């Protein structure tokens, strides 16, 4: 197997038992593909599919005027290039967007002859701005990165359910059906406790369902014919003959003697009819049974009965037979009658009973009844009734089932075709009611609405399309009204279309929708996870309060689609989920997961993606089934999931149809990063997966020694690590950029074969963590496409590295690790292992005020020179200045109005005659509790305002850097082009050239070297092909120079034009502070198994427990944190990490002893190839083996994939390999090598029993004590209650709550209590008085009336109760 450039530098030893057939798909594919389908930016106009923007335009256009003479058609749309790139948008606080322009055609017909076209106008119209997605799947909105989270909602279609017996006290199951469209009115059908079937539209008042059936044109006779089978009777003068249908009699009690045609009694009266009786009647050839008169009474007629002579209706369908009716029928000579067959078991009389409750006469009456229900109080005119009825379910404008909805309706109603009209049809309604009646009759099953076949995912593209469509339909209404005037006023399309509604709909969605979220950017994993999140909340979804247990629970269909582990704790549990590692969406928006095909018990390499619905048809085995080397299932019974319930059963191998592609396919990206996940309790695994997203990137990333093999995938797919887009040779590297000369094979002919990667340096993330990329390649390195060439935040050699590998001992230590506290060695702090850089952005704006403009200046009165020392002449701090809380960073003065002077000021004025300054100091100062180094300053100036020197110098600097970039590019491009030319020309025959080159001379390197490079183009090669290529290169270089000049001009224009600032703002300055945070007591740390704790003490190295060879532990954890929490994974990780560290030490010792490459190769072979996945070490050269060994000195990285990880014996093998007997003895290891005799650092005595010691990957989480530490003396108060505000952001106080008051009461500390509830809180006069007293040197309190008492009095008065405080 071939290793990539970075992979062979440090190979991760994998314990996976199964080779992967199917690679993990690109992690951000759902987001990026969805939005690409929405925009269809690069698709040719003619080939655009009807989805996204195209579908929205097609749905709204053509727009026809009210009189029908003018209409506007849509031709095509295109998106312009974005005016600023992503980085510029982030700096300037703009949205990264593109202008949408649509070409529309206005067609006006002739008034006299409406079929004749009078004129056609075609024009391109601006339709608003559409935000573009960045390459990593996020959006930049007003300068901040946001993510649109996908939504899991109920799929359109038809659903059948029952109330589980909760509605009615008897516990009777009430069945209901609901037809949910993608857009339009919901149609519900439901039984009530009396078994009458009702329908309702949009949850309005319910009406008998027969009204709906009549309104679609069915008569009562037809309704009964659809829902019942009939009994046929022939009337006799006394009694009647009934047509004998055997099945209908079984189980009934005979109400009279039943005889066969020969008159022999087969069933006696009051006996139950069984199968034998029916067989006897059948074998006797019975066709008719004679029944007495009372058998007919109470039966219901199926059809209207008309007098054959007079045409008079004798009885209506659905009438009950009485003696009177029978007499009437006999008198009229009616012989044949049909009645409804019903029984209590599986043929209930529901529709017949419903018809009786319905008093509408015909179709018109039924439609009027529906109109009255929808529009109560409006007069039902014929047109209005008809229009409303059509619009409810039959009009494409207001009703849309969508492709998914139609497919789901057809499959649920058992139709063969998956396609059909996008509106409801009469058949749909009728079939749904039939199916519901069958359910009530006990045939069929209700739907499970939590099944992932009934829930689909709406991605960014679809959500944006819905918003765009909403905006476009508002435009449509305006256009319709103005189209009438188009002809008379000679208007053009752009006069008719106003793009505001579209822009505002899109802006509102991206800016403030519940699904548009501020991107979690703490580390690369949090970005990836946020983009793969699936939320059931949001518009059209559930709400936290109403979501029950079932919706939140793990469902069998989540397998391989949604992660059962990763979900937030708290009110959102189960409503916000994460996409499983291999899952993807199908065309309909349902989640699919890949399975390997199995044929006759043998695995094939075919991988199929199955949705939850399709999977229900197959038997699917688990990935850990035992295989032989040819891929045959060898166990007698294999555990597999089958049936719609996906129950796990044991089946024989020949029945297996599919098998999982990988053991990790059931979990999400975050959960698959937890090694030994299979040994952790699910609750702790959940915490572990969630806490990895809060890990702060450390100064130096350190790859986990024990990983799972997914680290590289996450790091690369997140976009943090830079990948080479094309292979080539590294030409130039510095901290800011990597330049690669592309391989000839990958370069397109005639283009410049140079890729320049500008790296991100010290940039602030959304969570104020630091994003910084470092190059990993040297000049001359050969890289292939997809290789990692630079590391980003929290990545180490292209692998995700969220924390640091620590030597951990599990033992109590003087109570400092009580209750999950963590004891840390000073060495960890001294080596800056957990030091992180946080970047704070502080900004100040100078506005235009009523009293005049604010000014950013260095000239501030009454500020000491020491305070101004950091400011330059423009009043802005220098880069590199180290600032503390309270220091001025940008000087700013605001004009203030004439104020009342104090007597002192009056005196000064009288003496010095100067006018005291009329400006107040409103400078930007460093907030309390913050200190750091200024690393960047940006100045934005409004158009038309003169720039200060600082702003100008920033622009010059930026242009200089850009010019340098371009010159570099040009140098490489030209150098590269001339190298290619040299390879092309040397040895070719020329017809002439500079320096009097003779015709027919072969070109040599020496001749070319003598020429000035630009004169090479004057050579006239003999071969036409070569001449053409020479000319092409010349044109390409000139074009490139021209392009570069244009690009530079464009950049200069962008930088020198004024900035777009909010109204009233003249100038804005942003200062970026880098704050270094070392680990300190109070910081939260965690492992990857949900083992979290707070640092309690940083202990001197000499006091830490140490091993026999003197190595002290880095961290001491409490062993009591393991058993009750059942996350044993951390212990296994510690053992395997210990082996990894030991193997690294062995390799390091060999390198120190300058061992031969062959020896090292042998040891590496033992490590890598004796169990688990085999590595191809033979393909590496000796130099590469030595470089690999050098990188393994600190520990051999292991991968133990989720559910397919290292077994106990493998960990033992690795420990034995790492610590041969001599080393084990020296370190004081026990026989198992998993525990060590440790010594107390303070006394030097050995602890009385061995201690588990090893290496664990520990994270520092984003809950830092520096961000939480806060104190207040005086500060802001709440307006109404006058009590201090709460929280650090508001500079609030600590709440002295109910329980604290009880504590003081219990101690009887009455004066303390009085002070707490009055002068320290909301006694306004008392507060000021205390201040006065302290100033005067008196330490006394005058407690008065708390303001909240007045609030209470006012509240009571507002209830209309007069209350007064009487003082006596």
From Swiss-Prot:
Keywords: DNA-directed RNA polymerase, Nucleotidyltransferase, Transcription, Transferase. It is an enzyme of class 2 (transferase). One of its GO terms (biological process) is DNA-templated transcription. It catalyses: RNA(n) + a ribonucleoside 5'-triphosphate = RNA(n+1) + diphosphate. Pfam families: RNA_pol_Rpb2_1, RNA_pol_Rpb2_2, RNA_pol_Rpb2_3, RNA_pol_Rpb2_45, RNA_pol_Rpb2_6, RNA_pol_Rpb2_7. InterPro entries: DNA-dir_RNA_pol_bsu_ext_1_sf, DNA-dir_RNA_pol_bsu_external_1, DNA-dir_RNA_pol_su2, DNA-dir_RNAP_su2_dom, DNA-dir_RNAP_su2_hyb_sf, RNA_pol_bsu_bac, RNA_pol_bsu_CS, RNA_pol_bsu_protrusion. It comes from the Bacteria. The RNAP catalytic core consists of 2 alpha, 1 beta, 1 beta' and 1 omega subunit. When a sigma factor is associated with the core the holoenzyme is formed, which can initiate transcription. DNA-dependent RNA polymerase catalyzes the transcription of DNA into RNA using the four ribonucleoside triphosphates as substrates. This is DNA-directed RNA polymerase subunit beta.
């Amino acid at each position: 197997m071939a290793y990539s450039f970075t992979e062979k530098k440090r190979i991760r030893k994998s314990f996976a038992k199964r080779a992967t057939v199917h690679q993990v798909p690109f992690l951000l594919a759902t987001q990026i593909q969805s939005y690409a389908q929405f925009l269809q930016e690069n698709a040719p106009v003619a080939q655009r599919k009807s989805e996204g923007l195209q579908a929205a335009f097609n749905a709204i256009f053509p727009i026809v005027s009210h009189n029908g003479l003018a209409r506007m058609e849509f031709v095509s749309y295109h998106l312009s290039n974005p005016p600023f790139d992503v980085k510029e948008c982030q700096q300037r606080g703009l949205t990264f967007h593109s202008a949408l322009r649509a070409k529309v055609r206005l067609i006006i017909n002739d008034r006299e002859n409406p079929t004749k076209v009078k004129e056609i106008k075609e024009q391109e119209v601006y339709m608003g701005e559409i935000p573009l997605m960045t390459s990593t799947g996020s959006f930049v909105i007003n300068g901040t990165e946001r993510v649109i989270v996908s939504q899991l909602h109920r799929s359109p279609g038809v659903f059948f359910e029952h109330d589980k017996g909760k509605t009615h006290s008897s516990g009777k199951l009430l069945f209901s059906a609901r037809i949910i469209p993608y857009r339009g009115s919901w149609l519900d059908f439901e039984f009530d406790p009396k078994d009458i079937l009702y329908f309702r539209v949009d949850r309005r008042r319910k009406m008998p369902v027969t009204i709906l059936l009549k309104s679609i044109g069915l008569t009562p006779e037809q309704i009964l014919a659809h829902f019942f089978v009939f009994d046929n009777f022939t009337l006799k003068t006394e009694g009647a003959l009934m047509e004998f249908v055997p099945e209908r009699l079984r189980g009934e009690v005979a109400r009279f003697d039943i005889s066969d045609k020969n008159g022999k009694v087969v069933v006696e009266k009051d006996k139950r009819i069984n199968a034998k009786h029916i067989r006897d009647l059948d074998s006797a050839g019975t066709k008719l049974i004679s029944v007495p008169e009372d058998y007919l009474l109470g039966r219901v007629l199926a059809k209207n009965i008309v007098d054959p002579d007079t045409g008079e209706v004798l009885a209506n369908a659905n009438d009950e037979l009485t003696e009177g009716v029978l007499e009437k029928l006999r008198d009229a000579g009616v012989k044949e009658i049909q009645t409804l067959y019903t029984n209590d078991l599986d043929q209930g009389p529901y529709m017949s009973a419903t018809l009786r409750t319905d008093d509408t006469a015909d179709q018109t009456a039924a439609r009027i009844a529906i109109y009255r229900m929808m529009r109560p109080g409006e007069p039902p005119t014929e047109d209005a009734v008809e229009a409303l009825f059509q619009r409810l379910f039959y009009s494409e404008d207001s009703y849309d089932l969508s492709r998914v909805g139609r497919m789901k309706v057809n499959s649920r109603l058992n139709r063969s075709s998956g396609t059909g009209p996008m509106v409801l049809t009469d058949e749909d309604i009728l079939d749904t009611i039939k199916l519901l009646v069958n359910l009530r009759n006990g045939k069929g099953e209700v739907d499970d609405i939590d099944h992932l076949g009934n829930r689909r995912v709406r991605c960014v593209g679809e959500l944006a399309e819905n918003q765009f469509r909403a905006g476009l339909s508002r435009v449509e209404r305006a256009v319709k009204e103005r189209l009438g005037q188009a002809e008379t006023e000679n208007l053009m399309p752009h006069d008719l279309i106003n793009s505001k509604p579209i822009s505002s709909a899109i802006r509102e969605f991206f800016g403030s929708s519940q699904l548009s979220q501020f991107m979690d950017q703490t580390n690369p994993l949090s970005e990836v996870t946020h983009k793969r999140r699936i939320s059931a909340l949001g518009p059209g979804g559930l709400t936290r309060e109403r979501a029950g247990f079932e919706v939140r629970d793990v469902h069998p269909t989540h397998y391989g689609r949604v992660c059962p582990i990763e979900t937030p704790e708290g009110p959102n549990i189960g409503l916000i989920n994460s996409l499983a590692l291999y899952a993807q969406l199908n065309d309909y928006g349902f989640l699919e997961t890949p399975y390997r095909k199995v044929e006759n018990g043998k695995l094939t390499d075919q991988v199929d993606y199955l949705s939850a619905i399709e999977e229900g048809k197959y038997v699917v085995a688990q990935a850990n089934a035992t295989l032989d080397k040819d891929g045959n299932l060898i166990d007698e019974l294999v555990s597999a999931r089958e049936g719609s319930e996906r129950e796990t059963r044991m089946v024989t191998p020949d029945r297996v149809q599919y098998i999982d592609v990988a053991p990790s396919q059931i979990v999400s990206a975050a959960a698959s990063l937890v090694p030994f996940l299979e040994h952790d309790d699910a609750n702790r695994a959940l915490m572990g997966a969630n806490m990895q997203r809060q890990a702060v990137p450390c100064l130096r990333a350190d790859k986990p020694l024990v990983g799972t093999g997914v680290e590289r995938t996450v790091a690369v797919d997140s976009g943090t690590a830079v990948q080479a887009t094309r292979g080539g040779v590294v030409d130039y590297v510095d901290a800011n950029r990597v330049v690669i000369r592309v391989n000839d094979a990958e370069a397109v002919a005639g283009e410049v074969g140079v890729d320049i990667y500008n790296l991100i340096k010290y940039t602030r993330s959304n969570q104020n963590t630091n994003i910084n990329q470092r190059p990993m390649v040297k000049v001359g390195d050969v890289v292939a496409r997809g290789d990692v060439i630079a590391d980003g935040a929290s990545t180490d050699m292209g692998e995700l590295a969220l924390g640091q590998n620590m030597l951990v001992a599990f033992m109590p230590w003087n109570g400092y690790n009580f209750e999950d506290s963590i004891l840390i060695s000073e060495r960890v702090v001294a080596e800056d292992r957990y030091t992180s850089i946080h970047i704070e952005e502080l900004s100040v704006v100078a506005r235009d005020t009523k009293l005049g403009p604010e000014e950013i200046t260095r000239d501030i009165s009454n500020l000491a020179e020491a305070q101004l020392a950091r400011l330059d002449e423009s009043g802005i701090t220098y880069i590199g200045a180290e600032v503390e809380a309270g220091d001025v960073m940008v000087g700013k003065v605001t004009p203030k109005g004439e104020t009342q002077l104090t007597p002192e000021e009056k005196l000064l004025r009288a003496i010095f005659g100067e006018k005291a300054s009329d400006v107040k100091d409103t400078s930007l100062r460093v907030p309390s509790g913050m200190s750091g180094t200024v690393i960047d300053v940006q100045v934005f100036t409004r158009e038309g305002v003169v720039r200060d020197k600082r702003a100008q110098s920033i622009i010059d600097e930026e242009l200089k850097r850009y010019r340098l970039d371009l010159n570099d590019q040009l140098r490489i491009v030209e150098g590269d082009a001339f190298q290619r030319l040299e390879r092309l020309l040397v040895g070719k025959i020329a017809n002439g050239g500079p320096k009097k080159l003779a015709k027919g001379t072969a070109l040599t390197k020496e001749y070319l070297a003598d020429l000035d490079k630009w004169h090479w183009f004057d050579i006239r090669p003999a071969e036409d092909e070569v001449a053409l290529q020479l000319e092409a290169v010349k044109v390409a270089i000139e074009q490139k120079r021209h392009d570069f000049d244009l690009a530079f001009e464009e950049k200069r224009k962008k930088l020198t034009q004024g900035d777009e600032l909010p109204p009233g703002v003249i100038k804005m300055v942003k200062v970026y502070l880098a704050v270094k945070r070392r680990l300190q007591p109070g910081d939260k740390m965690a492992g990857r198994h949900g083992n979290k704790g707070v640092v309690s003490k940083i202990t001197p190295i000499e006091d830490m427990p140490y091993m026999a060879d003197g190595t002290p532990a880095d961290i001491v954890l409490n062993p009591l944190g393991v058993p009750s929490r059942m996350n044993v994974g951390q212990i296994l990780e510690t053992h395997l990490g210990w082996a990894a560290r030991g193997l690294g030490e062995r390799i390091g010792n060999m390198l120190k002893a300058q061992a031969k490459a062959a020896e090292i190769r042998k040891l590496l072979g033992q490590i890598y190839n004796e169990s688990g996945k085999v590595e191809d070490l033979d393909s590496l050269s000796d130099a590469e083996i030595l470089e690999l060994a050098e990188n393994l000195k600190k520990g051999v990285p292991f991968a133990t994939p989720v559910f397919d990880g290292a077994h106990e014996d493998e960990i033992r093998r690795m420990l034995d390999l790492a610590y041969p007997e001599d080393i084990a003895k020296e370190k004081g290891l026990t026989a198992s090598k998993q525990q060590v005799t440790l010594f107390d650092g303070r006394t030097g005595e050995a602890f009385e029993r061995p201690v588990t010691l090893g290496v664990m990957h520990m994270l520092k989480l984003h809950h830092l004590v520096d961000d939480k530490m806060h104190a207040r003396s005086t500060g802001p108060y709440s307006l109404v209650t006058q009590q201090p505000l709460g929280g650090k952001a508001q500079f609030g106080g600590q709440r002295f709550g109910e329980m604290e008051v009880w504590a003081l009461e219990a101690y009887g500390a009455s004066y303390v209590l009085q002070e707490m509830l009055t002068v320290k809180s909301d006694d306004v006069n008392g507060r000021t008085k205390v201040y006065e007293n302290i100033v005067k040197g008196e330490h006394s309190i005058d407690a008065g009336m708390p303001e909240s008492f007045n609030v209470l009095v006012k509240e009571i008065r507002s209830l209309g109760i007069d209350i007064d405080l009487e003082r006596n």
